From Swiss-Prot, chains A, B, C, D, E, F, G:
Organism for this UniProt entry: Desulfatibacillum aliphaticivorans
PROSITE patterns on file: CHAPERONINS_CPN10
HAMAP family per UniProt: CH10
Pfam family, one: Cpn10
Any GO MF annotation of the entry: protein folding chaperone
Main location: cytoplasm
Disulphide-bridged cysteine pairs: none
Protein family per UniProt: Belongs to the GroES chaperonin family.
Keyword match Chaperone: yes
Quaternary structure note: Heptamer of 7 subunits arranged in a ring. Interacts with the chaperonin GroEL.
Protein name, per record: Co-chaperonin GroES
Biological processes per GO annotation: chaperone cofactor-dependent protein refolding
InterPro entries: Chaperonin_GroES, Chaperonin_GroES_sf, Chaprnonin_Cpn10_CS, GroES-like_sf
Cellular localisation: Cytoplasm
Length: 95, 95, 95, 95, 95, 95, 95
């Protein structure tokens, strides 16, 4: 069982933000909004352009991404917590 | 008797949100807005693009979908409660 | 004598909302905004697309439609009350 | 001497709203915004589309129209009061 | 020496608004925003459409125009006061 | 050393606004926002249209321009103060 | 390890703003929002136009840029602080 996001939405598994992540990104502890890190587990088919064509996403399943701390909507699937957000909420891909 | 939604609207039968649903999705009990689950019972013919063509919906009758808890407008048809919402209010399809 | 709506506007005769309507739709009595039911008595020629072409309406004279309770502007024609609204205010067609 | 409206604007002579008009439209006396009735005395050449072409108006000089009570800007020409408004402020044509 | 307006801007010499103007327009003294009258002394080359082409102005130097009382920005050139405004602020041309 | 503005931005050297400028423009002393005068010292390559083409600027280096008093962002280059603003902030070219 | 920005975003290493920078730009100490200076260390593939094509960025890795003081989102990569922002936040390139 899985969840298929619509349009330009993606399903993200948030990574623990208390520790230094595998990717080596350390989230600074300041007053500004801080980005969070996660792994993409499902992607939508893409955004609909005005002329009806699909614009494919730049991100893909397996990408580790940074996104705004308060981006997306939380959902639990088979006991695991995920986030559904739009691709535009993704700041960058960790490589 | 039924209700035919216009444009990119869909008619959704909300599923009980107190229990673990058949699809296995458990809605987490947090302060953030939580998505609800439902089954699509009717879909509109699609959104009108700027050039007048129809952009068909991605969802179809029978799809089980997640949507924002406060999305849509309530309506009763022959004693049953439904929600009319836009396809864009749908976060993803449960598979 | 009649009133010809402009562009994507329609003229609607509101149906009594206190009782169960002929179409079998019962409006639930909740705190949320509730849709109202009416019959279309006149339609405009359609919305102007950016390139100047007309986009014809999906609804037609005689359709029974649901719309937001506070949609439209009231007007009296020969003693009868009507509502002028945009097609986008219509949630669905009762069939 | 006259006033030539620009783009999609029209010049309207408001009709007395206290009495039942010639067209038979009676404005209901409720708390909602009520439309007013007038006759078009001049029309602009049309709105400019994004590609520079003109989109001709649907209304023409002589049409009796309904419009929002607070639509338009008042102006006096040779002692007579008129309203300048956009065609989109017109709700419908009285026939 | 003169001022060349950019894009769809025009330079207007405001006419005295206390007296009945040559054009015969009398500004009514009500609480609503009242239009003012002026003569166009310079026009821009036109607005840039999305595809980069110019959309020429409808008004030209010498036109007497009505515009919203608070439209535009005041500027003095060689001791004379003018207004710089966008063509869209013009309500109509006095003929 | 210089600063190359991006897109439709320009770099402007503000002229003293206390005295009558060379161009003969006297800024009136009223409560309304008053335009300021400056000389363009650098221009960007132009705005990106929706289809990816560049829309060249109407102004060029050396033009004396009027702009809104609070337009732009201040920056110091080698001890001299400049303003970076968008071309749309320019009201007109002094000739 | 690095961070690949999405779409029209860029990754910027902020330069110390207390001293006169190498590029010779001195940030004035006024009440207005002051621009900051930085060096671009990574750029996204470009913004998606409405028709699905990419619009390449004007800036490139190595460019020294000015940007609004509060632009972008802070992130730490391997102990170093960076800013992720959109290209539109860049005011100009220091040359």
């Amino acid at each position: 069982m899985k969840l298929q996001p619509l349009a330009d939405r993606i399903l993200v598994k948030r990574l623990a933000e208390e520790t230094k992540t595998k990717g080596g990104i350390i989230i600074p502890d300041t007053a500004k909004e801080k980005p969070a890190e996660g792994e993409i587990v499902a992607v939508g088919p893409g955004r609909n352009a005005e002329d009806g064509t699909k614009i494919a996403l730049e991100v893909k399943v397996g990408d580790r991404v940074l996104f705004g701390k308060y981006s997306g909507t939380e959902v639990k699937i088979e006991g695991e917590e995920y986030l559904i957000m739009r691709e535009d909420d993704v700041l960058g891909i960790v490589q």
